[in-house]
Amino acid sequence: MASEDGLAPGRVLYHYTNAPGFLGILERRCLFASDVWFLNDASEVRYAQTRMAERVRQYLGPDQPWLQALLELSEAKPGWLDDVFVASFCEEPDLLSQWRGYAAGGFAIGFAADGLAALGDGPGAPRLVQVDYGAGSGRRRLRGLFEQLADGGPYSAEERERLARTVLLPEMARVKEPSFAEEKEWRLLVVESRPERILFRPGATGVVPYVEIALPDPSPVREVVIGPAADQQLHRRGVEQLLARRGYDGIEVRESTSSLRL
């Protein structure tokens, strides 16, 4: 299982998206993970860098020079996260802030969490992780990682950088400010540097790098929530036809009860 977090049996996680994103996911049977720098609020990456640097400082010691390498990399190489791609999910199926921020006139696709966690194993496989909110979250897990690495030295400069990337990239991509805690976010993380795997699409920030994450058969899609819209019944009719004609069986379709008006 490519997840390090506890998943309750039967848990469903929701990906909020607009109509083009919804069609892309169901027609192509894949998820689209965006470069972490091109998420809706890029300041969250800078926040994560600051928090990570603070945590690394807590563990610096004279007999652990590789921790100094971690600190230098987390502070001095902002381009470090260029290889990290994220697909976001929410525990809540009908959250007003998610409709307003990510999917006005769109949909929330419910995925079986265990299906997402099982998308791959080994280096480079997608990892399903729960987002940490605030400076204090994740400290126990990070301490365990540091202790594990410290016990395995000494390392060459190249090995230290590789290990630092292995530790810091996923950790930095799962940290957000406490003000976002309402989202109860989970992320599917992919570390990908091969040029041929990186695609591009237009977005609010211009040209957005992304990678595709293939979904298995049978599909982990369990539910579709029709977002706030002027005519939800018409939206529902289109969704039900798409699901039926593309072989998505047993998918629950329901309508948002959000007070958002478009």
Model-based region annotation:
Residues M1-L262:
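Partner-binding and oligomerization surfaces adjacent to conserved cores of proteins
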